[in-house]
Amino acid sequence: MNFKYIVAVSFLIASAYARSVQNDEQSLSQRDVLEEESLREIRSIGAKILGGVKTFFKGALKELASTYLQRKRTAEDHEEMKRLEAVMRDLDSLDYPEEASERETRGFNQEEIANLFTKKEKRILGPVISKIGGVLGGLLKNLG
């Protein structure tokens, strides 16, 4: 009789333990689900805020770019425009990270070519413009 009693109590303890483990697993999975849902909500809120900030910066940068385009640009303005364009590319790369490296490489190559052309242009046009300016200055002096 003692043996039957020990087996019955052991069985009850084992089943109670199994139920408690099962309940713990369920509560953990429910907690995980709740945590995951709250993380999703936080991420979506963060994504919305980031999207709003990106939209604001894109609009502000486009406004600055249009302001610079409507007036005569100096070398400093040109450099500032390059920086603004780089920032715009960076903001766009946040939307499409896989294409960013391709776009960046393509932009760098085009920018490098433009810089080389500008340097050649300055070397050729600098002396020509100074000679033309000297000739025009001499003509104006003779006419005046």
From Swiss-Prot:
The modification Leucine amide is found at residue 143. GO terms for biological process: defense response to bacterium; defense response to fungus; killing of cells of another organism. InterPro entries: Bombinin (IPR007962). One of its GO terms (cellular component) is extracellular region. Residues 19-43, 74-123 form a propeptide. Belongs to the bombinin family. This is Maximins 5/H4 type 3. It comes from Bombina maxima.
